[in-house]
Amino acid sequence: MSSRILVTGGSGFIGSALVKALVRGGHKVRVLDDNSRGAPRRLTDVEKDIEFIAGDIRDASAVANAVRGMDEVHHLAYVNGTEFFYTQPDLVLDVGVKGMVNVIDACRAANVRKLILASSSEVYQTPPKVPTDETAPLIVPDATNPRYSYGGGKIISELMALNYGRKHFDRVLIFRPHNVYGPDMGFEHVIPQFVVRLKRLAAQHPSGRLPFEIQGDGSQTRSFCHVDDLVRGVLVMRQKGEHLGIYHVGTTEEVSIGEVARRIAAHAGRDIEFKPRPAPAGGTERRCPDIT
């Protein structure tokens, strides 16, 4: 059955992939994005099949206009990228919290009673158990560390979605993606950053092992999920998920950050020598979802 769906942050990395999948599924899709972080080129393949509204998620009137006439809202608009967490935590929280308030208010005003929220594995910070299931505590270990602006904002968003959802929505679903990667993901994340750095080092050092700086000793692990797999998981959740349900979307293969660097270097036929440097406060040693 075709639905009218608003995707906020729809020109972003994950948002655009979701938009394309929804269009392929026969849905009528509207996108709200100010393209401050997203890129219109990501939607070129479907630009004739969607309605695009240029607007800031913090602008209540823009959000209200975008929500009006929809059957459901998929809220993905946010500021991602570790550098922003440390350098612009006020922006991260402004977009995250105001955006969530505006989406809920607009849905209530327009009687849109279906909401899907993109959360994050960052809500766990350092989880007490790995693999981590969806019932693990959500914490902000140090409110003075700007690193937690992102995870803290996501926790607030989840609390709002769940508690408003009990009274004002028929269906609220939350997904927590884990370290998503794929084409055109931008340069704010570990895989593309490593590619750029290794390319530069290879040009500077035509032979021999590449001196590669890494936070700590590179033993920190993550479970990376391709964006296409993430979208498939979100669509399954949309179809089968329970009201007020929270779902991990990811894989269970843990890979060390050092191994990520080694694999990228190997594609260029090079070896690397790690140069450890201090990791910023607030990092997580292990992150892997329980997806059972």
Region locations from a protein language model:
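N-terminal Rossmann-like NAD(P)+-binding domain of SDR-like oxidoreductases, especially those catalyzing
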Residues: 1-180
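C-terminal substrate-binding subdomain of Rossmann-fold SDR/epimerase-dehydratase oxidoreductases
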Residues: 18-24, 55, 200-292
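Residue-level signal for the nucleotide or nucleotide-sugar donor/cofactor binding architecture
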Residues: 38, 58, 87, 95-98, ...
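A short, amphipathic alpha-helix embedded in the catalytic core of nucleotide-handling enzymes
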Residues: 103, 164, 193-198, 233-237
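A glycine/serine/threonine-rich, flexible loop-to-helix segment
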Residues: 129-132, 187-195
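Short, cationic motifs built from Arg/Lys/His that form the positively charged side of catalytic pockets
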Residues: 154, 176, 183-184, 222, ...
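Hydrophobic alpha-helix immediately C-terminal to the catalytic Tyr-X-X-X-Lys motif of short-chain
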Residues: 156, 160, 164, 193-194, ...
